[in-house]
Amino acid sequence: MKRAKKAKKEKKESTPLPFPYLASIVLLPWWISLSFKKCFEPWVTHWCNTRQSKFFLNDIQEKGTLERFIELEELFLLDKIIKEYYPDTHIQRLWIRIHKETIQLVKIHNEDHNHIIFCLSTNIISFTILSGYSILGNEELFILNSWVQEFLYNLSDTIKAFSILLFTDLCIGFHSPHGWELMIGSIYKIFGFAHNDQVISGFVSTFPVFLDTFFKYLIFRHLNRVSPSLVVIYDSINEELI
């Protein structure tokens, strides 16, 4: 029995940490997504510019475009007001400016259209690659998991308690709502959803509370079973910070 444990330990120690596998998980989806964007960006841009579409891709583009058209309409009304007091050359320059603004508005609309298409495509590619890694790289994931568990096990109880408090305060603590708002806003922008302040505010005000309670329960249950001394250190540090 002892020989088996010793052989298993020696095998674990002799197994190298899969740094290439870890680097490929992080860099390969990004590299493939970037290559996809560079290769297909001219084709998608040409397709979007030549395609006559009667509908907007999403509510965000529609809202932004309507705001710009309102600005152009205000310029047109201003033109009617001041044309009696200024010469025709000034009116002509104003019309040229309105024409340029309209062209620029169409370009911005097409760029937003292309951006959302590329974001959706790259997200799908990244998800597919990571899913393939999780299915095909079981052995590498097992080795990586064993190294992470060993690293966490070798940490002192004080460092573990401090890390838990730091993680919970950043993700679900008092200052976390600002981070949640930025993250949800970025997700909305990437996937082309309409920005809804009421939904974001309701989510930020409720979800971190439930998540905080759930995490504290899991942490207390796990630490109380694994290391009761760590629970004492965690409570003492938490009381001092509060």
UniProtKB/Swiss-Prot annotation:
It is found in: Plastid, Chloroplast inner membrane. Pfam families: CemA (PF03040). One of its GO terms (cellular component) is chloroplast inner membrane. GO terms for molecular function: antiporter activity; proton transmembrane transporter activity. The keyword Chloroplast applies. It is a multi-pass membrane protein. GO terms for biological process: potassium ion transport. Disulfide bonds: none annotated. The keyword Chloroplast applies. Contributes to K(+)/H(+) antiport activity by supporting proton efflux to control proton extrusion and homeostasis in chloroplasts in a light-dependent manner to modulate photosynthesis. Prevents excessive induction of non-photochemical quenching (NPQ) under continuous-light conditions. Indirectly promotes efficient inorganic carbon uptake into chloroplasts. This is Potassium/proton antiporter CemA.
